[in-house]
A protein has these predicted regions:
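Phosphate-binding loop of NTP-binding sites
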Residues: 77-211, 215-223, 332, 406, ...
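Acidic, Mg2+-coordinating active-site environments of NTP-dependent enzymes
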Residues: 57-65, 171-308, 330-334, 359-369, ...
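Peripheral docking tails and interdomain loops at the edges
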Residues: 407-423
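N-terminal leader/targeting and accessory segments in enzymes
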Residues: 1-80, 84, 260, 331, ...
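Active-site beta-alpha connecting loops in nucleotide-dependent enzymes
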Residues: 35-38, 295, 313-386, 413
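Short acidic-hydrophobic, aromatic-tinged amphipathic segments that line or gate anion-handling sites
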Residues: 69-73, 387-396
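ATP-dependent carboxylate/acyl-activation modules
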Residues: 96, 296-298, 415, 419-420
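Short amphipathic alpha-helix with an adjacent loop that forms part of the alpha/beta core around
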Residues: 163, 395-403
Length: 425
């Protein structure tokens, strides 16, 4: 195989595509990727022994093998293959990026579109330079729409992913302080995320946007094919979970979700707007949103034997931390407790942002305890003697196990592994 067209024919005839020899099935296409700690190009013989029919590799030993597409850069070839596959598709593709809420928004859009169409979508948060191509290559001939999440922690990454995915509809959820170590500044975050809208502008796609967010409004200022989020309003409720109302030209609707946190109303607005754009009936949209249950530590409410716990432990940066604390503080519950994991990739903002969080905790009424995990918090231990500090999540288990009758916010990044504390609560 010498051309991308020949490789594409091999891809279409293969039983599946794999980048892991442990998951190879008979007749699959194996793409050998090189990472920081592994190089799958050294495992070609094993891949073929396990049943691979074709392979993409930079291993010169297999350059003349007719089953092999030889290339100096297997990742770029994977991306080129995904882009070529995308070019063969005539279905709507929804692209999503943003600092916070993109995975929940992706999940909500997916369930909404799935209520009417056969929908392909990003699995989990496979939203990077490898995950986006794999998502695109998972789109089958009978799929009617696709939803593609795009993440980034360095400048230029969204532009590259959007050029591969070529979305017909796209949205940026928001912009905030995250991955500053990679982006360099908040402006760097804005410029990177805005690339999704620039891609839509270049192809005539539809830009969906939050008209309440000035940063997002600035991104689409010079574009005509824009659709603002449908208006929605929170419905006051004693329930822990979010309820809201919205209306179209004919009717008003009330939706009761399984999501914790008022900030999720924006994610729901995005899903409703995209659903309407794609022709999904309001009744189906509402039922899909009401039927969605969050997983993987995102906006979940748990009642344990001893405590009520809000679990938001998959992603943490200053803006998402503030949103979670705003929602937590607004609840009328007594005997509150926070368990927070340190935020990563903040560069020069690491110290001031963690200090801001600690100072914020002092102002929360009815806060009985604060358990802080990670060195970025612990460096301020002397200034906050009433708080408990631990270097690692495992070190906090004993303190956590003593909590009873508390209303608890468990907030951090997936790298904090705060989910390991749930059984102790």
């Amino acid at each position: 195989m010498n051309t991308i067209e020949e490789l594409y024919q091999a891809f279409k005839s293969a039983s599946c595509l794999s980048t892991d020899t442990r998951n190879i099935s008979q007749g699959s296409l194996f793409v050998a990727l090189k990472g920081e700690r592994f190089d799958a190009n050294t495992m070609l013989a094993d891949a073929f022994q396990r049943g691979a029919a074709y392979a993409v590799t930079s291993n010169a030993e297999f350059a003349s093998d007719p089953r092999v597409f030889f290339t100096p850069d297997t990742l770029k070839t994977l991306q080129d293959l995904a882009s070529y596959h995308r070019d063969q598709l005539s279905i709507p593709v929804v692209g999503i990026t943003g600092t916070n809420g993109k995975t929940t928004t992706k999940e909500l859009i997916t369930v909404v579109l799935s209520s009417k169409f056969k929908t392909a979508a990003t699995k989990g948060n496979l939203n990077n330079h490898i995950g986006v191509p794999l998502t695109l290559l998972s789109i089958r001939p009978d799929d009617e729409v696709a939803v593609v999440e795009m993440g980034a922690n360095h400048p230029g990454e969204i532009a590259a992913l959007a050029a591969i995915a070529k979305p017909t509809i796209g949205l940026v959820t928001n912009v905030g302080l995250a991955h500053i170590q990679g982006f360099g500044s908040l402006q760097g975050v804005k410029d990177t995320k805005a690339a999704l809208y620039r891609q839509l502008i270049s192809t005539g796609g539809t830009a969906v946007y939050d008209s309440d967010n000035d940063d997002i409004v600035d991104m689409i200022a010079d574009y005509d094919n824009i659709v603002p989020y449908i208006a929605a309003k929170k419905v006051p409720s004693e329930s822990e979970t979010l309820s809201f109302e919205w209306a179209d030209a004919s009717n008003a609707y009330q939706v009761a979700t399984n999501l914790c946190g008022d900030y999720n109303i924006k994610n729901a607005q995005a899903a409703i707007t995209v659903g309407l754009l794609c022709g999904v009936e309001p009744e189906k949209i509402n039922a899909a949103i009401e039927g969605y249950t969050p997983t993987n530590g995102r906006s979940q409410a748990l009642q344990t034997a001893r405590n009520h716990v809000i679990v938001d432990a998959y992603n943490a940066n200053p803006s998402s931390m503030n949103a979670a604390l705003d929602n937590f503080e607004a609840r009328p519950n007594a005997a509150k407790c926070v368990i927070l994991g340190a935020m990563g990739e903040l560069g020069p903002e690491q110290e001031p942002q963690h200090l801001k969080v600690l100072n914020r905790l002092r102002s929360i009424p009815n806060l009985d305890c604060a358990i802080l995990i990670g060195q970025a918090f612990a460096m301020f231990k002397a200034q906050f003697p009433s708080f408990q500090f631990f270097p690692q999540t495992a070190d906090a288990k004993e303190a956590v196990s003593q909590l009873s009758g508390k209303y608890i916010l468990l907030k951090g990044s997936n790298s904090n592994h705060l989910d390991q504390l749930i059984d102790s609560l």
